[in-house]
Amino acid sequence: SSSGSAVAVAKGLISFSLGTDTAGSGRVPASFNNILGYKPTRGIISNRGIIPACRSLDCVSVFGLQVSDILEVLLVLEEWDPQDPFSRKKKILTSKSFPERPKVALLEDDQLDFFGDSIARKAYDKSVSVLAESGLYPDTVDLSPFLEAAELLYSGPWVAERHLATSPLITDSP
């Protein structure tokens, strides 16, 4: 997980940090620390040198306090790396890569579960209002396809890929 990277930004020790993200290990610590965590499109940032969890899904993630900070980091790091098979030759980012009014995905009401915690529900509703007031565009999404993808990650073919990626490390450094 990249929790240390998230904490360092949240505490103001640094203005941005890098981590890794396969299935949320960059974005989840960011959310727990009230900062932004961004998992870029595969191949924008080279993965050379990271210890793989699931090579086809791993990405270097970026943590920051503002979208503009994250974009600046991405613009610097976006380079083709001939030693990374997923690296992209064509640059796709520009200073205008993020929309002025970004869309924020929210779960449909029938998919929300606060486990009976009315305080958490009120905090969620207030957060949605703050997002809308801050210029972001809240939009609802169906969680079902994401749950199906997660099932594949933890019970499907990617389990074998993770085993292949991590076996040499475990064998060499028990």
Residue positions per predicted region:
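Predominant activation on well-ordered alpha-helical scaffold segments within soluble catalytic domains
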Residues: 6-10, 39, 68-75, 125, ...
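Short helix-loop capping/hinge segments that flank enzyme active sites or metal/cofactor-binding pockets
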Residues: 98-107, 153, 157-174
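Acidic helix-start/capping segments at beta-turn-to-alpha-helix junctions
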Residues: 144-156
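Short, solvent-exposed loop/turn segments at the edges of secondary structure
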Residues: 1-3, 30-33, 40, 54-58, ...
